[in-house]
Swiss-Prot record:
Disulfide bonds: none annotated. The lineage of its organism: Bacteria, Pseudomonadati, Pseudomonadota, Gammaproteobacteria, Vibrionales. The active site is at residues 155, 159. SUPFAM superfamilies: Glyceraldehyde-3-phosphate dehydrogenase-like, C-terminal domain, NAD(P)-binding Rossmann-fold domains. This is 4-hydroxy-tetrahydrodipicolinate reductase. The gene is dapB.
Length: 269
């Protein structure tokens, strides 16, 4: 059984991760952390997420419980995630990263640490979204040369980064299938007189409103027809269950950088 620590356990996503780990027969909730100033430090993790008492309380530093867990699941913020990554590097633990908003330099740091410890990192842990990534690769190879490609994403009002990591992942899947780097073809905002659309660009539009869990659409538009590939999430447990699945899969894997494509065995599609 894989012993799981959840970083940011008292947040919306953290509570779902605790619940998902509790209900996964191959996993055990072994630790959970929050910021030292949080009033929820010391609260039982089971009671925190509406389950039975686990006899495992929220701590203010996972280093204090380093012997209690095998894998950290981290959906917090870049600085916090990098601290937990360093902890994994120091003690030989594995980590599942769902945090988004990393800079290019921070991504390079993650890649470097992944040479020493097992890391799964994905912009989205839903099975459906990762299948969409594969579908987008295939669509881009067939239609990318002659269609205009746009990505539209919508999330709740509290999301702090834009575009979403999933939207960027969709763009990377499309650009990679066409032999491009997303950074060379992405257009993240349009305003005023922009001129005509260039042939290779991939446009992004962002919506932040209400309580939208996550909606993403990639559009391949030609004259007379368009293809839209859409994923809509209605419950954060979708992401939490996928992340716990990744943690179970990652346990005892050799050091390396893995994605949900590896976890789900989608490379053969």
């Amino acid at each position: 059984m894989v012993r799981i620590a959840v970083a940011g356990a008292a947040g919306r996503m953290g509570r779902n991760l605790v619940k998902a780990a509790h209900h996964n027969p191959a996993a055990k909730v072994a630790a959970g952390s929050e910021r030292p100033e949080s009033s929820l430090v010391g609260v039982d993790l089971g009671e925190l997420c509406g389950e039975c008492k686990f006899d495992v309380v929220v701590c203010d530093d996972l280093a204090k419980q380093i012997d209690q867990f095998d894998v950290i699941i981290d959906f917090t913020a870049p600085a916090s995630t990098l601290n937990n990554l360093a902890l994994c590097q120091q003690y030989g633990k594995s980590i599942v990263i769902g945090t988004t908003g990393f800079t290019e330099e921070q991504r390079e740091q993650i890649d470097l640490v992944a040479q020493q410890v097992p890391v799964v990192m994905a912009p989205n842990y839903s099975v459906g979204v990762n299948l969409v990534f594969k579908l987008l690769e295939k669509a881009a190879k067939v239609m990318g040369d002659y269609c205009d490609i746009e990505i539209v994403e919508a999330h709740h009002r509290h999301k702090v980064d834009a575009p979403s990591g999933t939207a960027i992942g969709m763009g990377e899947a499309i650009a990679g299938a066409m032999g491009n780097k997303l950074s060379d073809v992405a257009v993240y905002a349009r305003e005023g007189i922009t001129g005509e659309r260039t042939k290779d660009e991939i446009g992004f539009a962002t919506i932040r409103a209400g309580d939208i869990v996550g909606e993403h659409t990639a559009m391949f538009a030609d004259i007379g027809e368009r293809v839209e590939i859409t994923h809509k999430a209605t419950d954060r447990m979708t992401f939490a269950n996928g992340a716990v699945k990744a943690a179970v899969w990652l346990h005892e894997k050799p050091a390396g950088f893995y994605t949900m494509t590896d976890v789900l065995g989608l490379n053969d599609l």
